[in-house]
A protein has these predicted regions:
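Class I (Rossmann-like) S-adenosyl-L-methionine-dependent methyltransferase catalytic domain
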Residues: 13, 19-130, 144-227
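A conserved beta-strand element that flanks and buttresses the S-adenosyl-L-methionine
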Residues: 136
Length: 227
């Protein structure tokens, strides 16, 4: 998750082909070898009101938008997979918005799985028995190198039969849009164009971080897409 600046500047399209790892020049082979998603990480970025990037209130507003948009588009939500579910902020929000939907939280952090009972797994290769109507991947992909992120996007598509909500910190966001004092910058920063290239063969961009699979029943008019 990232904290937006109070006064947002317009995002400019990315044109560079490289990516950066903020504050470090190392390139890990595995996410766990570079990043530690332990208790201290979640205390700083999610629990401490002085340093956290967001809380249940911000997820509630985001969930209200996603739910309203999917209802407008005609995309039913009966099953949800939340990759990188963290403290589980999406769970009560979705329970309120889609009370009959079945929620599955997937998390790579051993600490959080032990505490909250999430499914232990990675967005790179965890696979559900059946694809879900809604897949959430909120602030996860920037912790993966480009090869891992490419695999993860393919895995998101395999686990999704309807809509994907995706948020990832991009190079342009770090330079122009986010509050650097709260946003975790120790991540892989890739230009937004890189993500769009990976997503284009698999999803139709619907705006607002929502992407639709080809087999979604939702109907988009051409000006509603963000091609």
């Amino acid at each position: 998750m990232m904290q937006r600046r109070r006064s947002m500047r317009r995002m400019l399209p990315g044109s560079t082909a490289h990516f950066d790892l903020c504050h470090s020049s190392s390139t890990p082979r595995q996410m766990s070898s570079r990043f530690s998603f332990d208790r201290a990480y979640y205390e700083r970025h999610y629990r401490d009101p002085r340093t956290r990037v967001g809380g249940l209130g911000s997820v509630q507003r985001l969930g209200d938008f996603v739910a309203a948009y999917l209802r407008y588009l005609g995309q039913p939500v009966r099953t949800v997979i939340d990759f990188g579910c963290g403290l589980g902020h999406w769970s009560p929000v979705l329970q309120q918005l889609f009370p009959r939907a079945r929620y599955t939280g997937v998390e790579v952090s051993e600490y959080l799985c032990a505490r909250y009972g999430w499914e232990r797994g990675s967005v790179i290769d965890w696979t559900a028995a059946r694809p879900a109507d809604l897949v959430i991947c909120h602030g996860v992909l920037q912790y993966l190198d480009s090869r891992q992120a490419h695999r993860a996007i393919g895995n998101l598509a395999r686990n999704c039969r309807g809509a994907l909500f995706l948020e990832a910190l991009t190079k342009e966001d770090w330079e122009q849009n986010c509050d650097r004092e709260r946003t975790d910058g120790n991540v892989y920063l890739r230009p937004v164009a890189w993500y769009r290239r990976q997503l284009r063969p698999l999803f139709t961009p619907a705006g607002g971080g929502v992407f639709l699979r080809p087999d979604s029943p939702a109907v988009l008019y051409e000006l509603e897409t963000c091609r």
